[in-house]
Amino acid sequence: MKKFTYLFFWIILNVFVTKLVLANEASALDITEDDFIIGDENAPITIIEYASMSCSHCANFHTNTLPDLKKEYIDTGKVRMVFRDYPFNYPALLGSMMMRCIPGDVRYDYMNALYQLQNTWVDRDPKVSKKELYKIMQSGGMTKDEFDSCYSNLDNENLILEGVMAAQKEFNIKSTPSFVINGNIVEGNKNIKEFRQIIDKILSE
């Protein structure tokens, strides 16, 4: 993915470095109540996806690969999928913040809808991204007050940015999507055939 960033975004992000250093040493492999998860918690394989909602390769994964992965491995109890935010710019951060304001039972559908409609709301102009994203969220039933409240929720913003720093520290993630499969990092978008090879190999061991 081409990493276009805004200087102010990374300034905000780096504010949290000190906080992370002083915090309790928790592994980024630990699954917490802040994670968005689908699949059986007792599944033999856990896949953690780090994705940026403005990333075209992430959109490709969610649109073309994830449906088959879900049908073949997640819905059958073989894989637990953990979705984590790794925004590279303001639009991605905004999209991630909106997802944290969506109830868990419908968040999966909203998340994939934003990836499918990525070209309509991701823009270099922050005002354009915010305006177009609101249109999408409004069509799903979110009110203007709810959108504004979510937009100004610093707790959610902090959680996202702290998660980025934790993943960067532990996994040295440089691009999205990146996957951590049972503790092993797999970089780059993979098609369903490649996922089958990785997953089936683990299941056969």
Descriptions of predicted regions:
Residues 2-8, 14-89, 161-169, 200-205:
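Extracytoplasmic thiol/disulfide redox context detector
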Residues 87-176, 180-193, 197-204:
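Cysteine-centric redox/oxidoreductase cores and disulfide-bonded domains
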